[in-house]
């Protein structure tokens, strides 16, 4: 009775692994990953359903088929966290691993072995080969060593090689790409992204999570909060925004300061693996004084306007709230326009100035800004950075030529031949120069040691 226990193992080794190690499969997977990565860059990620319904309507559909329903159904609104994108990464990593063990490591093993040519006809398969006087052998060996070749001798055969680094480079490239893939997958599973709009002078916990992985709970901060000490904007002389800043403190549950930094665009605050980016801004409120009353802080709400961003609030001017004025502003430069109940422009005031309206004095004390923070944690980033560092090293190493030269003394002739995996013209020039430099040297008796040995 024949056992079938070995059939799955045979299928794995003889069918599945060769398919995974096929370069064509790796190229197809890489192109698919690149295509979907581009789509994730072009299509806004992590937005609300209303956003996609407004920007990707069913009529007319983008490119004739791309509607909000297609985006949401396939997962193009969160490409990098979808099961199929992660599956592509895993499959690509598996293909690279199989290729490394099936092709690159055996190639390295073969390159490190001593390959002696014993018969003159073996030189016929080399792209570069010639015959010399046997007297040139000693000087040719010296030339090989001078050009940093490792020389091995067995009887009348010589094998020399250099540039084994060029065979290690592709393995490092594969390993680095696998490391990058692992970092991307780990970041998708354990990372999170939150967005917070925090008024100046207030404290808030990280709560508005817009994207998170299934294992991200440990990364979301629970024992500390963000305190905005101050938020301000620098403007150009033309009135355009130059840069906006947030003076942030990380505080624990007892309000003890754990960390503090002033951040701006491209200069984030990092704390315990969580990065806080300056992403947006808004106007939270306005502080006003009516006659000699205490200073009142009123919230300001964003309003729809064709000309840009605008914020507004309503200030009552009578105790029974039967009358009031509307305050509007477009920035934090301290200028506010005042309108009465009929929509008529009453005045334009700046911070510290007063205006008379409805028989009272209204003083603009301060505009209160809000900082928009993007708070992220991606535990896979160190892996990705390490992978890219290794990738650059591996690419540089791959450009090193692996060159091999064989010598054989037979039939009163010295057979010389060589090959390289890149830079053929440079290798040919080097070989010719070594042959020419040895043309006038005296002969050296060949070694008769039966065991391979490295010539010092």
Curated annotation (Swiss-Prot):
The keyword Lipid metabolism does not apply. The chain crosses the membrane at residues 23-43, 82-102, 168-188. One of its GO terms (cellular component) is plasma membrane-derived thylakoid membrane. GO terms for biological process: cytochrome complex assembly. It is a multi-pass membrane protein. It is found in: Cellular thylakoid membrane. InterPro entries: Cyt_c_bgen_Ccs1/CcsB/ResB, ResB-like_domain. It holds the Pfam family ResB. It comes from the Bacteria. Keywords: Cytochrome c-type biogenesis, Membrane, Thylakoid, Transmembrane, Transmembrane helix. The keyword Hydrolase does not apply. Required during biogenesis of c-type cytochromes (cytochrome c6 and cytochrome f) at the step of heme attachment. Belongs to the Ccs1/CcsB family. May interact with CcsA. This is Cytochrome c biogenesis protein CcsB. The gene is ccsB.
């Amino acid at each position: 009775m024949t056992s079938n226990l070995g059939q799955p193992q045979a299928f794995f080794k003889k069918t599945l692994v060769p398919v995974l190690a096929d370069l064509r499969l790796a190229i197809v997977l890489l192109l698919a990953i690149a295509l979907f990565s581009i789509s994730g860059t072009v299509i806004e990620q992590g937005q609300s359903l209303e956003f996609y319904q407004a920007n990707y309507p069913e009529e007319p559909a983008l490119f004739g088929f791309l509607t909000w329903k297609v985006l949401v159904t396939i997962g193009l609104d969160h490409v990098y966290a979808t099961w199929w994108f992660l599956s592509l990464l895993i499959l690509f990593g598996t293909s690279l691993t199989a290729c490394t063990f099936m092709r690159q490591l055996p190639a390295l093993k073969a390159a490190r072995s001593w390959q002696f040519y014993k018969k003159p006809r073996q030189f016929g398969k080399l792209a570069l080969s010639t015959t010399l006087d046997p007297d040139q052998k000693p000087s040719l060996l010296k030339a090989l060593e001078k050009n940093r070749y490792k020389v091995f001798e067995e009887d009348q055969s010589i094998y020399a090689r250099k540039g084994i680094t060029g065979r290690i480079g592709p393995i490092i490239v594969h390993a680095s790409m696998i490391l990058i893939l692992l970092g991307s997958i780990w970041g998708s599973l354990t990372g999170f992204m939150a967005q917070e709009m925090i008024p100046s002078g207030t404290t808030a916990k990280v709560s508005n999570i817009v994207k998170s992985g299934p294992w991200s709970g440990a990364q979301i901060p629970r024992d500390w909060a963000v305190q905005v000490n101050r938020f301000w904007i620098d403007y150009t002389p033309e009135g355009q925004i130059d840069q906006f800043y947030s003076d942030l403190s990380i505080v624990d549950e007892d309000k003890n300061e754990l960390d503090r930094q002033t951040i701006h665009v491209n200069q984030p605050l990092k704390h315990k693996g969580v990065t806080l980016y300056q992403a947006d801004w808004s106007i939270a409120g306005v502080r006003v004084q009516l006659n000699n009353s205490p200073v009142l802080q009123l919230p300001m709400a964003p309003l729809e306007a064709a000309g840009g961003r605008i914020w507004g609030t309503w200030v009552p001017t009578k105790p029974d709230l039967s009358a009031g004025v509307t305050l509007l502003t477009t920035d934090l430069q301290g200028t506010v326009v005042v309108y009465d109940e009929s929509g008529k422009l009453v005045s334009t005031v700046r911070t510290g100035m007063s205006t008379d309206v409805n028989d009272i004095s209204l003083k603009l004390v301060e505009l209160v800004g809000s900082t928009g923070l993007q708070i992220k944690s991606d535990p896979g980033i160190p892996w990705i950075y390490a992978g890219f560092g290794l990738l650059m090293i591996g690419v540089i190493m791959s450009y090193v030529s692996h060159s091999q030269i064989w010598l054989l003394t037979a039939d009163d002739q010295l057979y010389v031949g060589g090959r390289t995996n890149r830079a053929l013209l440079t290798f040919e020039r080097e070989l010719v120069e070594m042959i020419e430099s040895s043309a006038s040297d005296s002969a050296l008796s060949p070694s008769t040691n039966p065991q391979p040995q490295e010539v010092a």
